[in-house]
């Protein structure tokens, strides 16, 4: 079976695993984008650690959860955002100010919306987590 959106599957796996109280989940399809998103989540304390496992097909990520994820999802369609427009999207996707993060793909890599604001660059919204 083909997966239409591996990032959406990964984010829903993280949300479901955290809601069920699991300590470890397996993301069945690995990609560079999923790896970069997991790295951002680890830097901000939403997951403990993750490991890439090569299974000879697509690869997998084994993620250790710490229970801090309440909701994680993708933003579709992937909206292009300028530097001054992040606050509008924060109100839509995050529950409160300074709670959670929006993950942005920029020309300088994948980062949070706060890092993009500090650097003064825009990008494309790809996911959120709180």
Curated annotation (Swiss-Prot):
InterPro entries: Ribosomal_uS8, Ribosomal_uS8_CS, Ribosomal_uS8_sf. GO terms for biological process: translation. Gene3D superfamilies: 3.30.1370.30, 3.30.1490.10. GO terms for molecular function: rRNA binding; structural constituent of ribosome. GO terms for cellular component: cytosolic small ribosomal subunit. Keywords: Ribonucleoprotein, Ribosomal protein, RNA-binding, rRNA-binding. It comes from the Archaea. The keyword NADP does not apply. Signal peptide: none annotated. One of the primary rRNA binding proteins, it binds directly to 16S rRNA central domain where it helps coordinate assembly of the platform of the 30S subunit. Belongs to the universal ribosomal protein uS8 family. HAMAP family: Ribosomal_uS8_A. Part of the 30S ribosomal subunit. This is Small ribosomal subunit protein uS8. It comes from Korarchaeum cryptofilum (strain OPF8).
